[in-house]
């Protein structure tokens, strides 16, 4: 049986971890980094880039580069008005669902997230040296049922059996408390990431991690701080030059990168210069953007965002039934907690210095890996008791939401309640399932609807309809309704608002596999072309440097083989390139043997193109698409 990996599928960055014995290990990706940008790009040549490679080309390819896709997971098109304004890529309405359109192809948010998850899966497989099929994936604690189901669907598309969906603050608490199982303390986990904010209050003791309450805001994170800076520098430039830089997608992407960089710098400095040369041009010539941004100005720009942080904190403490003074530690999680103002707010609100002992970028993935270890049986003496973040209920007479399960109820849980008909001789009822805290049904999130029919005609109030809500350990809801008189029952597993069917998910899984094969084929082609390019370069170089040392009868043959390789490089297939390289290498081998014999065994043998590029280089770079040309000098045996 293989390992269960832990994945933090973040708005800005993602991270993967796995249990190695009794300790979790964060896995470095192929670029050597412990986190991977949650960015996807589709190039004009059809290549699909994920992570750092996608981020590097974002400025020149903004409309085909997808970032912050997590903000659209499990949400309807009419629910994302604010988010879609921040995206330079095209977001369309397809049957009420939010979709991304790139190069005339339409992708669901789950499909895009699956591309990121595939990268995480591959990273783990490279590290472990074995196939990975199971994972624990984290979500913001305040994600609703539809968003959780969408995350699970993304995992399935990526070829992963998602064993558990776990809340990010809870995962962080697991990582924080793994070595503190014998202690008893009450902890607040303050998680401010790239796109979401969560606050969870937990009680840790004797290996039990019990969530007392959770609250948050799924529209608040680092992206929002970046946008404040973008608007500020764009407005300042417009005042000076009369040009709105936000109207051009490439320029907007430059502003986004500069804003993110400035925000990060202001965490360690009190001021920073935003310098973007040649940001635009007029008839008068090029224009440059140079603006100094102080930390005080940044804090003033984001004052409303900082204010929004405290309300969820107040609700979480109130719902936990704990006093502020009972909180032993406040653990900071998420990259945005590095902002000094955020740390100051936390200190003032909780009346104590926040705990910075965990890596805010990695701790969530570590916690997910620990949960994977618990499910696998590798981690013992750990019991996790999480809660549902929002109340769940149904619509009843008058459009009222009647709650069956209150927010912050420990999961898994099951609740039953008996309802009746609203009219005489009513033979069917519609069960409208809702999630939220508002008293009226229309103000809450619709999770699903289903009908229970064939109810025997009776006066209103007589039929007994038993409604059962069942939340599993992933926080995903199952609802059933049963006519107690006839025993007839209808049930529904609440699906994501994305409405992805099993057939659609299966098709997306096949597409993902095809892309993986295409990516491998493309990588092989690039590797082969890089080796061929190096062989052409080094052959030409040695032909010139060795001169008449090459036998006169061999030179035309060698030059002919070189021309064949050049032609294959311009117009040929991978197979023709390999064939031409093999032929050229064979010629070089014969020449190298001749030179060695003519110079004698005491002399240094000239380093041939066949040896330097086709031989050793192909071995070294067979698994790396980024082949670099190596320059070298031919050492004549007489010149030392």
From Swiss-Prot:
It comes from the Bacteria. Residues 630-640 have a biased composition (Acidic residues). PROSITE patterns: HSP70_1, HSP70_2, HSP70_3. It comes from Pelodictyon phaeoclathratiforme (strain DSM 5477 / BU-1). The keyword Nucleotide-binding applies. This is Chaperone protein DnaK. Residues 595-613 have a biased composition (Polar residues). Acts as a chaperone.
């Amino acid at each position: 049986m293989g390992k269960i990996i832990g994945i933090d599928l973040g708005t800005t960055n993602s991270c993967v971890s796995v249990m190695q014995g009794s300790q979790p290990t964060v896995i470095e990706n192929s670029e050597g980094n412990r986190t991977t940008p949650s960015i996807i790009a589709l190039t004009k040549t059809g290549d699909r880039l994920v992570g750092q490679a996608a981020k590097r080309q974002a400025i020149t390819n903004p409309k085909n580069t997808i970032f912050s896709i997590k903000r659209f997971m499990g949400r309807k098109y009419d629910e994302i008005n604010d988010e879609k304004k921040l995206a330079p890529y095209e977001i369309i309405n397809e049957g009420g669902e939010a979709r991304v359109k790139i190069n005339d192809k339409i992708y669901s948010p789950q499909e895009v997230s699956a591309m990121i998850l595939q990268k995480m899966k591959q990273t783990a497989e490279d590290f472990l040296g074995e196939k990975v099929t199971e994972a624990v994936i984290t979500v913001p604690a305040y994600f609703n049922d539809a968003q959780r189901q969408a995350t699970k669907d993304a995992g399935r598309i990526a070829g992963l059996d998602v064993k558990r969906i776990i809340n990010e603050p809870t995962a962080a608490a697991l990582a924080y408390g793994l070595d503190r199982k014998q202690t008893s303390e009450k902890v607040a986990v303050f998680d401010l990431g790239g796109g979401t904010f969560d606050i969870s209050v937990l009680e840790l003791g004797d290996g039990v991690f019990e969530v007392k309450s959770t609250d948050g805001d799924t529209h608040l994170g680092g992206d929002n701080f970046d946008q404040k800076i973008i608007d500020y520098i764009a407005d300042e430039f417009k005042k000076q030059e009369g040009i709105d830089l936000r109207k051009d997608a490439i320029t907007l992407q430059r502003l986004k990168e500069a804003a993110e960089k400035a925000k990060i710098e202001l965490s360690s400095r009190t001021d920073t210069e935003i310098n973007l040369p040649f940001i635009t041009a007029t008839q008068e010539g090029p224009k440059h953007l140079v603006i100094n941004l102080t930390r005080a100005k940044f804090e003033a720009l984001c004052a409303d965002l900082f204010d929004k942080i405290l309300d969820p904190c107040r609700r979480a403490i109130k719902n936990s039934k704990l006093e502020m003074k009972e909180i032993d530690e406040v653990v900071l999680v998420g990259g945005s907690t590095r902002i000094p103002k955020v740390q100051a707010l936390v200190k003032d609100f909780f009346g104590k210095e926040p705990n910075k002992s965990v890596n805010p970028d990695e701790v969530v993935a570590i916690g997910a890996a620990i949960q994977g270890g618990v499910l696998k049986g590798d981690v013992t003496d750990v019991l996790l008791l999480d809660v549902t973040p929002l109340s769940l209920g149904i619509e009843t007479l008058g459009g009222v939401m009647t709650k069956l399960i209150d927010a912050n109820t420990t999961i898994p849980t099951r609740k039953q309640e008996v309802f009746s008909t609203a009219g005489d001789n009513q033979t069917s009822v519609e069960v409208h399932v809702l999630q939220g805290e508002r008293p009226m049904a229309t103000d809450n999130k619709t999770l699903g609807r289903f009908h229970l029919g064939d109810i025997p005609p009776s006066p209103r109030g007589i039929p007994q309809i038993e409604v059962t809500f069942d939340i599993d350990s992933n926080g995903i809801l199952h609802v059933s309704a049963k006519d107690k008189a006839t025993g007839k029952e209808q049930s529904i597993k609440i699906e994501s608002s994305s409405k992805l069917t099993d057939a659609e998910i299966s098709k997306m899984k096949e597409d993902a596999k095809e892309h993986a094969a295409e990516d491998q084929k493309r990588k092989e082609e690039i590797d082969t072309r890089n080796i061929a390019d190096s062989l052409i370069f080094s052959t030409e170089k040695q032909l010139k440097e060795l001169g008449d040392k090459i036998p006169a009868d061999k030179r035309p043959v060698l030059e002919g083989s070189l021309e064949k390789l050049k032609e294959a490089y311009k117009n040929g297939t991978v197979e023709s390139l390999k064939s031409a390289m093999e032929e050229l290498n064979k010629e070089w081998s014969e020449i190298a043997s001749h030179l060695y014999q003519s110079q004698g065994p005491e002399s240094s043998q000239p380093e041939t193109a066949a040896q330097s590029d086709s031989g050793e280089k192909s071995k070294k770079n067979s698994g790396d698409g980024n082949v670099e040309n190596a320059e070298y000098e031919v050492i004549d045996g007489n010149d030392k």
